[in-house]
Amino acid sequence: MNEAPAEKQKPQQGKRFSERLPQWLRQVLPRGSVFTHTDATLKRTGLATVCEEALCPNRTHCWSRKTATYLALGDTCSRRCGFCNIDFSKNPLPPDPEEPQKIAESAKALQLKHIVLTMVARDDLEDGGASYLARIIHTLHQELPESTIEVLASDFQGNVDALHVLLDSGLTIYNHNVETVERLTPVVRHKATYRRSLFMLEQAAVYLPNLKIKSGIMVGLGEQESEVKQTLKDLADHGVRIVTIGQYLRPSRLHIPVKNYVTPETFDYYRSVGESLGLFVYAGPFVRSSFNADMVLHNLQDKQSEIAKVPR
């Protein structure tokens, strides 16, 4: 009889195992009173953030700018993707009914003008957690009516009705990551499919044609340049307008190993490829889905304003 695979061991929060990095991936981490305030605000509410749970290398940078990405529906995922550090369980705890208000109170305390939510996959819930996310967004609209809201959602196992529930909540940006090129998807996220992700992105574009739709990929997993270019084309063809591209850094030795470190020049090249397809691309070694999300939205709006002024 085959033994069930052991659940992965999670590295201590805030610690990433040591791995020799190229020069362009070494950074000086800022700290100060703003970082301390952000940290204290989040700890006071007991909220989970993807910044901590996923061991994001940008946590110090973002918290020093008084920004954070809230992790909704708890801190335990019903999937176990090979790149991700978030805890796994087939039966996560029920969602906290007080979480929507806690997130709103935290966002108010941090005076967030652009609020970013992400979520653990909740395949154990009938709608994948879509209605619960919608509750959070409605609460945020009530408490911070002037703030924009960005949501990085799961694929809801292809449930379009669940997607519509989320989209009807009034978000500013809908984000769903394909994460990697099609060939590597079964290894990187075995409970998802590349085509299903494209389908959900396209369904969002069809349902709300004016909605800003975003997706992202990691590089350094062994993908070929031609595969990245094809992925960018696929995203453009399925209604995506914003794409993030960043270097994959494994959280521990238990995760998928890095195959290669992509140079800044290659990120610039991928950006130019995406822009030639009509995409707004934010690419760089430390770029993540929610990294500088407020600046990305602002720059996109500026670019759209410039285009609108061009005589036709």
From Swiss-Prot:
InterPro entries: Aldolase_TIM (IPR013785), Elp3/MiaA/NifB-like_rSAM (IPR006638), LIAS_N (IPR031691), Lipoyl_synth (IPR003698), rSAM (IPR007197). The lineage of its organism: Bacteria, Pseudomonadati, Chlamydiota, Chlamydiia, Chlamydiales. Belongs to the radical SAM superfamily. Lipoyl synthase family. [4Fe-4S] cluster 1 binds at residues 51, 56, 62, 290. This is Lipoyl synthase. Binds 2 [4Fe-4S] clusters per subunit. One cluster is coordinated with 3 cysteines and an exchangeable S-adenosyl-L-methionine. The gene is lipA. Residues 63-280 form the Radical SAM core domain. Keywords: 4Fe-4S, Cytoplasm, Iron, Iron-sulfur, Metal-binding, S-adenosyl-L-methionine, Transferase. It comes from the Bacteria. Residues 1-10 have a biased composition (Basic and acidic residues).
